[in-house]
Curated annotation (Swiss-Prot):
Keywords: Isomerase, tRNA processing. Substrate binds at Y110. Its EC number is 5.4.99.12. This is tRNA pseudouridine synthase A. One of its GO terms (molecular function) is tRNA pseudouridine(38-40) synthase activity. Homodimer. The gene is truA. CDD domains: PseudoU_synth_EcTruA. SUPFAM superfamilies: Pseudouridine synthase (SSF55120). The lineage of its organism: Bacteria, Pseudomonadati, Pseudomonadota, Betaproteobacteria, Burkholderiales. GO terms for biological process: tRNA pseudouridine synthesis. Formation of pseudouridine at positions 38, 39 and 40 in the anticodon stem and loop of transfer RNAs.
Length: 272
């Protein structure tokens, strides 16, 4: 039996999240149907991170087991022929049976693209979050950065956890929160050992609230320490959220994600 790792991009705007559900339009169902048409047999996939409805991926990783003998690019070309335009494999890589897309991952990275201003921009609808601000007003990005500093390190992130979260522990390690602004755009990068359900979107709600001046920067540390979801801001919209990267031990040589063909082109190129 051969184990294959696959890299996947998708525009999540039209899908009910990653995970297969009866009578729902999910990324997993479309992918497994396409794989079946290519391989001639139903093959189950294991994913690095189950994204929610409306969330996108530039660096999703899956694995599957198969008896088929195919060249790596044959998987990419063949499966893509049966996928809708909003989903595409980027690479395929043979791996040993020790590889596991979910359990072997030691770091995950999400980006968020946020547009601010007095009116929405239809051309990025579904692909960027939006915060209405009066003409001439901007988010206080410096305050947002100050607030985000408390998130670094190992913490109990229960305050940012969805009620339906199935993670065994709320304790995660946040390695980095980088915030960049460019006119009406604000881009955020979150790197952590793993994320709880809705964790990034709940953090976004809090950071935007700080940026709007509704709370001081030190408020976020109080929310974190309180460990109660009711203390935090409402969950922010999924539209601008992208799973950009998943890291694995070096021997597996899993390709890094390439965000160049997205809203994030060049935004974090000089960030560590």
């Amino acid at each position: 039996m051969n184990r294959i790792a696959l890299g996947l991009h998708y525009d999540g705007a039209a899908f009910s999240g990653w995970q297969s559900q009866p009578h729902r339009n999910t990324v997993q169902d479309h992918l497994e149907n396409a794989i079946e048409r290519f391989a001639g047999v139903r093959l189950l996939t294991t994913v690095a991170g189950r994204t929610d409805t409306g969330v996108h991926a530039l660096g999703q990783v899956i694995h599957l087991d198969t008896a088929l003998e195919r060249e790596p690019f044959s998987w990419v070309r063949g499966v893509n022929a049966f996928l809708p335009p909003s989903i595409a494999l980027q690479w395929a890589l043979p791996v040993d049976q020790g590889f596991h897309a979910r359990f072997l991952a030691f770091e995950r990275m999400y980006y968020y693209a946020l547009y601010t201003g007095p009116h929405r921009v239809p051309l990025v609808h579904g692909r960027a979050g939006y915060q209405m601000l009066p003409p001439g007003q901007r988010l206080d990005v410096d305050a947002m950065r100050e607030a985000a500093a408390c998130l670094l390190g190992e913490h109990d992130f229960s305050a940012f956890r969805a009620a339906e979260c199935q993670a065994k522990s709320p304790v995660k390690t946040m390695y980095d929160v980088t915030i960049r602004d460019d006119g009406n755009w604000v881009f955020l990068r979150f790197r952590a050992s793993a994320f709880l359900h809705h964790m990034v979107r709940n953090l976004m709600g809090c950071l935007v609230a700080v940026g709007r001046g509704r709370y001081p920067a030190h408020w976020l540390a109080q929310v974190l320490a309180g460990r109660e979801r009711k203390l935090a801001a409402p969950t922010f919209m999924p539209d601008g959220l992208y799973l950009v990267g998943v890291k694995y031990p070096d021997p597996y040589q899993i390709p890094a994600a390439d965000p160049s063909a997205s809203l994030f082109h060049g935004v974090f190129d000089d960030a560590a």
